[in-house]
Amino acid sequence: MQFEVKDLINKIKKDGLDEAERLSSEIILNAKQEAEAIILKAESEAKELKIKAEKEAYDYKRYSLEASRQAFRDLVIGTENSIKSLFKSALKDSVSSVYDSNFLRELIIRVLDVWGKDDKIDIMLNESDIDNLSSILKTSIRNKFGAEIEIKPFKGINKGFKVQQRDGSLYYDFTSEAIADILFEYLNPRFKEIIKLD
């Protein structure tokens, strides 16, 4: 009986050890499978994060380049506009410097020479030019054209003059601003060639 108990104890031990080994192997296998699943999931998430980060970096670089190009275009346009403005201002100053009293008197008389003798005409000058030219012009003009011509002050004129039929149907602008604008439009294509950056 003693052998039977001993055999029974050995058998229980052996069965317990076998069961423990089986459970242990099963736990280890499950742990390995879970670890592999966790590793695969982590690798997949890492790959997705890497792809997302690379896309964000690419997009950021692309947007930065686009913003840089736009800023450069804006700078070029702004510089071109500033240069045009300076050029136009210099042109206006040059035209204004030519408009002295003698030149204005000659120009007004020549314009009136080609105008119809029967027209009622208003000549508009700035106040300082009226003070300088009024008596000379009135004498020259009235002798040729009679009393149908009036010389009037006009605050909107810096240098130069405007000539208008009294009924308002015909109008010529010989102000320094208008002449500078005409010259600028004529010179603008050449000016663009000079400052062209290509």
Swiss-Prot record:
InterPro entries: ATPase_E_C, ATPase_V1_Esu. Keywords: ATP synthesis, Hydrogen ion transport, Ion transport, Transport. GO terms for biological process: proton motive force-driven plasma membrane ATP synthesis. GO terms for cellular component: proton-transporting two-sector ATPase complex, catalytic domain. The keyword Glycoprotein does not apply. GO terms for molecular function: ATP binding; proton-transporting ATP synthase activity, rotational mechanism; proton-transporting ATPase activity, rotational mechanism. Belongs to the V-ATPase E subunit family. Produces ATP from ADP in the presence of a proton gradient across the membrane. This is V-type proton ATPase subunit E. The gene is atpE.
